[in-house]
Amino acid sequence: CIIRNCPRG
């Protein structure tokens, strides 16, 4: 993700 800190992508 760009807005949130996602574990992948």
Curated annotation (Swiss-Prot):
Chief place where the protein resides:
secreted
Q: Any idea where this protein resides?
A: Secreted
Q: Can you name a GO cellular component term?
A: extracellular region
Q: Which UniProt keywords apply?
A: Amidation, Disulfide bond, G-protein coupled receptor impairing toxin, Secreted, Toxin
Task: Please give the residue positions where the record annotates the modification Glycine amide.
Answer: 9
Q: Name one GO molecular function term.
A: toxin activity
Q: Which PROSITE patterns match?
A: NEUROHYPOPHYS_HORM
Q: Spell out the disulfide connections.
A: 1-6
Q: In which tissues is it expressed?
A: Expressed by the venom duct.
**InterPro entries (UniProt xref):** Neurohypophysial_hormone_CS
UniProt domain comment: The cysteine framework is C-C.
Explain the purpose of this protein.
Interacts with high affinity with vasopressin V1b receptor (AVPR1B) (Ki=8.3 nM), although the displacement of specific [3H]vasopressin binding is incomplete (a 30-40% resistant component remained). Has weaker affinity binding for oxytocin receptor (OXTR) (Ki=175 nM), and V1a receptor (AVPR1A) (Ki=827 nM).
Family membership, please give it: Belongs to the vasopressin/oxytocin family.
Other remarks in the entry: Negative results: does not interact with V2R (up to 10 uM).
Name of the featured protein: Conopressin-S
